[in-house]
Curated annotation (Swiss-Prot):
Cofactor binding, per record: Binds 2 magnesium ions per subunit.
Keyword Disulfide bond: no
UniProt KW Nucleotide-binding keyword: no
Important for determining product length, annotated site positions: L84
Name of this chain's protein: (2Z,6E)-farnesyl diphosphate synthase
GO CC, any one term: plasma membrane
Protein role: Catalyzes the condensation of only one isopentenyl pyrophosphate (IPP) unit in the cis configuration to E-geranyl diphosphate (E-GPP) generating the 15 carbon product (2Z,6E)-farnesyl diphosphate (Z-FPP or EZ-FPP). Z-FPP is the precursor of decaprenyl diphosphate, which has a central role in the biosynthesis of the mycobacterial cell wall.
Species for this entry: Mycobacterium tuberculosis (strain ATCC 25618 / H37Rv)
Outcome of mutating V107G: No detectable activity
GO molecular function, one term: magnesium ion binding
């Protein structure tokens, strides 16, 4: 037996959403600048909803990504990073992977639409997803403005360990090109030097990392950048992630005291 009658659920939901909005408006200065999101649970959502084809979950999840980014923009968040395809995901069934890459390509093109006026960057190795999808993603991203009020990173073909290795290699390659000695190469490997060569170079580290579907781990997502990030987990599968869930994450973040390891 349901405690709350169905006819009352929608009004109560709207009232709760309004209260969350009002509370956040009072703590505007405490909002995160950069939110990173692990969009987990698309396949589990599809199966729990009775769909044999998990690609339906991916499509519903893709629609939620575009919606969530609008929430970020409306809330005044400056930067959002969404984890769309990890290097581990590339080991999935070929047919499932092909469908997933096609859906990701479609949603990135939607995110990059001129009407949004968002600046979009890919983070990861597009060479891992095939020539045609990579071409479409590069074309979409390059069409977005460099200067905008809202920036989006789409992590595709991304692995946190791989990013750190790539950053160190890029750092050493630059030093070698400048004629560095072996001793100078060793001295060049610093926290600042690695940070400057990450995929997210020039951007602030994430203040808040959100993961859906009940999993409480980073799974290689922004390993270097999230050293002092606040974490927020929810049991909701990604396609079922609601605006009130997003607002609750912001509310909980605004109530925390960040010590940055001190």
């Amino acid at each position: 037996m349901e405690i709350i009658p169905p006819r009352l659920k929608e009004p109560l939901y709207r009232l709760y959403e309004l209260r969350l909005r009002q509370g956040l408006a009072a703590s505007k200065s405490d909002l995160p600048r950069h939110i990173a999101v692990l969009c987990d649970g698309n396949r589990r959502w599809a199966r729990s909803a009775g769909y044999d084809d998990v690609s339906y979950g991916y499509r519903m999840g893709a629609a939620k990504i575009a919606e969530m980014l609008r929430w970020c923009h409306e809330a005044g968040i400056e930067l959002a990073t969404v984890y769309l395809l990890s290097t581990e995901n590339l080991q999935r069934d070929p047919d499932e992977l092909a469908a997933l890459i096609e859906i990701i390509t479609d949603v990135v093109e939607e995110i990059c639409a001129p009407a949004n006026h968002w600046s979009v960057r890919t983070v990861g190795d597009l060479g891992l997803i095939g020539e045609e999808p990579a071409r479409r993603l590069r074309g979409a991203v390059e069409s977005t403005p460099e200067v905008a009020s809202f920036h989006v990173n789409v992590a595709v073909g991304y692995g946190g360990r791989r990013e750190i290795v790539d950053a160190v290699r890029a750092l050493l390659s630059k030093e070698l090109a400048n004629g560095a000695t072996a001793e100078e190469l060793v001295d060049a490997v610093t926290v600042e030097g690695i940070s400057e060569n990450l995929y997210t170079s020039g951007q602030p580290d994430p203040d808040l990392v959100i993961r859906t579907s009940g999993e409480q781990r980073l799974s290689g997502f922004l390993l270097w950048q999230s050293a002092y990030s606040e974490m927020w987990f929810t049991e909701a599968h990604w396609p079922a992630f609601r605006h009130v869930d997003f607002l609750r994450a912001l509310r909980d973040y605004s109530a925390r005291h960040r010590s940055y390891g001190r």
